């Protein structure tokens, strides 16, 4: 009869609505596919692509920062060794030293120079050594800065094998040699100090970009949520109402 048909149609509509609400609660999404809202779904998908892109950019920046930070650690250690070398050179500048003492001081000085060589060789991360390689060679840091892949943060190689190791060429075999070594140490110390300033600035710049990208990603994620997320409190209330309606519909049919 007509009443039964109307009750059946109403129950079918209730069941359909119930299925939609349950799907929104289960997925947490009001717009789960383009069938729900093509405009919102398309925009959300594009924004999800941006979030994924920012994640890749941040991976590049993190690799760059780690490379720079390893170089900073190496340069700081070299700075400490240079201070020890300067103390040895000052000792050796004493013209009254006996031969045995000068030989011992020179041996210590040579060992410190070798330590610098080891530090330079060890200051590598992920195959890149900013201290060892010369300024024109490959391997320098070039990290993606943003979704615009042509925008990068670059950090040049510092050529310490030439600017530090080779520059410390004089030993402490005589007072004259010690005086020359002191001049070399002062020159190299200035180079290392300048390098630390350059690398520190680069590390802070990368860190700042990482922070900005993280905030940008959070804002985009929030925007995606505004477009497609379900209001779970509202949907839960709908679910309860539809369940009651469904029960009444079943009773009406019976």
Segments predicted by a language model, with ranges:
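Primary detection of the long, small/polar-rich alpha-helical "axial" segments characteristic
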Residues: 1-254
């Amino acid at each position: 009869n007509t009443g039964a048909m109307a009750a059946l149609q109403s129950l079918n509509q209730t069941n359909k609505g119930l299925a939609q609400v349950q799907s929104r609660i289960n997925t947490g999404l009001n717009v789960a596919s383009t069938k729900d809202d093509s405009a919102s779904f398309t925009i959300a998908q594009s924004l999800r692509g941006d979030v994924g892109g920012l994640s890749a950019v941040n991976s590049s920046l993190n690799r760059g920062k780690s490379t720079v930070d390893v170089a900073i650690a190496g340069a700081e250690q070299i700075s400490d060794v240079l201070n020890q070398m300067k103390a040895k050179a000052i000792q050796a500048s004493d013209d009254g030293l006996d031969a045995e003492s000068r030989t011992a001081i020179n041996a210590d000085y040579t060992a410190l120079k070798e330590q610098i060589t080891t530090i330079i060789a060890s200051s590598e991360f992920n195959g890149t050594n900013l201290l060892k390689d010369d300024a024109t060679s490959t391997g320098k840091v070039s990290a993606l800065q943003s979704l615009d892949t042509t925008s990068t943060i670059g950090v040049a190689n510092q050529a310490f094998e030439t600017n530090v190791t080779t520059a410390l060429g004089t030993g402490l075999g005589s007072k004259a040699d010690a005086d020359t070594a002191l001049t070399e140490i002062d020159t190299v110390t200035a180079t290392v100090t300048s390098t630390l300033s350059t690398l520190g600035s680069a590390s802070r710049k990368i860190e700042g970009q990482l922070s900005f990208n993280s905030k940008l990603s959070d804002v985009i994620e929030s925007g995606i949520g505004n477009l497609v997320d379900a209001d779970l409190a509202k949907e839960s209330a709908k679910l309860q109402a539809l369940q009651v309606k469904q029960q009444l519909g079943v009773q009406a049919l019976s």
